[in-house]
C-alpha cells in the first residue's frame, strides 16, 4: 500500500436496502493530518469500512460512520467499535465547515480509530477539538440524503445505510 499523496481520493459508495444512494468523493489534508490520512486510507485499502454503516446522523450537524460493530444488526453496540488501535490527535487550523471530513473520538483526544464524520453544516465549535483530515469534493448531496433519514433515539438510521470505500490516486 503506497503512501497517500495530494492526489489520493476516497470514494464512499452509499446504499440502503440494496439501492445505491450515490457516491461521496473525498480529498485529504495530508499536509496537516498525515497520520489520520494514512490510517483512513490503510483501513479502506484493507476493506475495513466495507459493509459498515452510517450509524449516527444528526440533521444540521453531521453523518458518522466507520464503526465495525455496525456490520452487526444489533444496533446496541453501534458507535462503540474501532480497529484495535488509536491515532494521536492532529488538531489543525482547517475549519469544521460543511463538507469537512473529521475523525470521531472519545473524551481522550488521542482515541481516534476508524470512526469518522462528514459535516453537513458548519461546526466551528469542533475546531481544534477534533482532527479535520479531508473534505468532500463531490457527493455532498448524498450525505444530505443520509442525514435526513428516519432515525431512532440514538440517531441511528432505522434503515441500514451501508458503505464501500475505495482509494484511488
Where are these regions (language model features)?
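Cyclophilin-like peptidyl-prolyl cis-trans isomerases
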Residues: 1-169
Amino acid at each position: 500500500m503506497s503512501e497517500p499523496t495530494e492526489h489520493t481520493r476516497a470514494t464512499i459508495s452509499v446504499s440502503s436496502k440494496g439501492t445505491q444512494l450515490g457516491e461521496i468523493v473525498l480529498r485529504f489534508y495530508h499536509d496537516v493530518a498525515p497520520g489520520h490520512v494514512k490510517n483512513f486510507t490503510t483501513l479502506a485499502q484493507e476493506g475495513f469500512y466495507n459493509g459498515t454503516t452510517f450509524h449516527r446522523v444528526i440533521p444540521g450537524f453531521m453523518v458518522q460512520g466507520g464503526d465495525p460493530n455496525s456490520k452487526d444488526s444489533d444496533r446496541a453496540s453501534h458507535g462503540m467499535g474501532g480497529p484495535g488501535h488509536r491515532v494521536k490527535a492532529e488538531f489543525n487550523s482547517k475549519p469544521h465547515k460543511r463538507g469537512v471530513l473529521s475523525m470521531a473520538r472519545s473524551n481522550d483526544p488521542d482515541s481516534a480509530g476508524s470512526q469518522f464524520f462528514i459535516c453537513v453544516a458548519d461546526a466551528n465549535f469542533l475546531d481544534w477539538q477534533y482532527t479535520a483530515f479531508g473534505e468532500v469534493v463531490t457527493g455532498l448531496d448524498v450525505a444530505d440524503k443520509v442525514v435526513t433519514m428516519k432515525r431512532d433515539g440514538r440517531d441511528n438510521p432505522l434503515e441500514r445505510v451501508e458503505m464501500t470505500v475505495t482509494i484511488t490516486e
